[in-house]
Structure formats: C-alpha cells, structure tokens
From Swiss-Prot:
The active site is at D44, E116. This is Ribonuclease 3. Mg(2+) binds at E40, D113, E116. InterPro entries: dsRBD_dom, RNase_III, RNase_III_dom, RNase_III_sf. GO terms for molecular function: double-stranded RNA binding; metal ion binding; ribonuclease III activity; rRNA binding. The keyword tRNA processing applies.
Length: 229
C-alpha cells in the first residue's frame, strides 16, 4: 500500500530518511500533540541565510539595504504560500477540527509556515547542503528574475513587504498633528510597528510624505536599512 506522503515528496523533489520529520512539519499547532512551530522557527532562519547568501553572490554590487529588500521579497509569506500551493501542501496538513472547517489548509500564513517547517525538517534530516539545494531549486526562478532595480520602492512599500515576510501585522499610521496655514501645512505622523516597542515619527508637507518619512525611520529602527541606501 503506497504512502500518501510519497507523492508530496516527489513534488518537493526530496525523499526524507526520517518521514516522521515530514509529518511533524505538516502538523499545525491546532492539531493535538506536537506541532511544527519549532521546525518553522528553524526553517525561517535557514531560509533567510540561504537566500541572503545567494543574493550576496548574485548581486556583488548591491548595497546592504538593497540586498535586505530583495531578500524580503523572496522570503515573504505570499511567495512561500504560492510554493506550497504549487506542491499542494495543503492537502497533507494536519489541522485541528476548527482550522479544518474554516479552511486553514488554504490560509496563506499556515501554508507559508508549513514551507518553513519543511525546510527545517530537511535540514535536520540530511543537513544544510540538502536544505540549500531545495531552497535554491524552489526559489531559483524568482531569484533569477530579480534585479537591484526592484528595490527602488518607496519606504512604505518596503516596510510592508518586510513585515509581511515576517508574518507581522501591517504598520499603522496616525496623523498626530497638523501645523501651519492651509496653504503651507506640515503634517506630523506616527508609525506603529509590532516589532518595535516605540513608534517612529515623520513630518512633511503632506500626509503621504510624512508617512513615507515615518516608514523610513521604522526600517532603520528595525535594522533593515541604515538610512544611507
């Protein structure tokens, strides 16, 4: 009798020596018993390292901030969820009854987390070389399509993509003050980011400009950019 997981292994292009690791990687926290959160943590670190290393060699002239933004595009949840859907990972997830009924097997965050957990499982199964080979095989097409020009996005977009790549809530912007005459106003905006304990601030001649300045400050505070890219 064939093992249903063999089909997923063929799609992933990897055969587990210890298939229990694969099962654990596909087990959501809503399912009774052990779950994939620790493997997800490990896989996230490996994914960021491997993609960072690949970008470092692929774009020798790119600056640190550009490399960070390119990496954020490749490792964001949307990208990983697309991979998972291509492999039909959702069909193999072990979910609690509530998540199953609510369509958790289609949810972007759950699919992205499962892909990271599978990366962690591959690493534990046969080591870094295997994990690197699979990551590059899966994300190679997207990697080859990137150019440093892709980083020429405004700070709000870059901040949003970075937070999405970490599975975080989107930033919240609030106008806290408006000064000056109607024809020459200055807007003061706060930006609240889940990963930062303090809000960042920006001001400018329009709400849009003030939000961009606050977003740029958040990127610096997060260590994603150094303020000179």
């Amino acid at each position: 009798m064939s093992n249903p997981l063999d089909r997923l292994e063929r799609k992933l292009g990897y055969t587990f020596k210890d298939q229990d690791l694969m099962v654990l990687a596909l087990t959501h926290r809503s399912y009774a018993g052990r779950n994939n959160e620790r493997l997800e943590f490990l896989g996230d670190a490996i994914l960021n390292f491997v993609i960072g290393e690949a970008l470092f060699h692929h774009f020798p002239q790119a600056r640190e901030g550009q490399l960070s933004r390119l990496r954020a595009r490749l490792v964001k949840g949307e990208t990983l969820a697309l991979l998972a859907r291509g492999f039909e990972v959702g069909d193999y997830l072990r979910l609690g009854s509530g998540e199953l009924k609510s369509g958790g097997f289609r949810r972007e965050s759950i699919l992205a987390d499962a892909m990271e957990a599978l990366i962690g499982a591959i690493y534990l199964d046969t080591g870094m070389d295997s994990a690197r080979e699979r990551i590059i095989a899966w994300l190679g097409p997207q990697l080859r399509e990137l150019t440093p020009v892709d980083t020429n996005k405004d700070p709000k977009t870059r901040l949003q993509e970075f937070l999405q790549s970490r599975g975080c809530d989107l930033p919240r912007y609030e106008v806290v003050d408006i000064q000056g005459e109607p024809h020459c106003r200055t807007f003061f905006v706060d930006c609240e980011v889940a990963l930062l304990s303090d809000k960042t601030h920006g001001h400018g001649g329009s709400r849009r400009i003030a939000e961009q300045v606050a977003a740029a400050a958040a990127l610096v505070a997060l260590g994603v950019e150094n303020g000179h890219d």
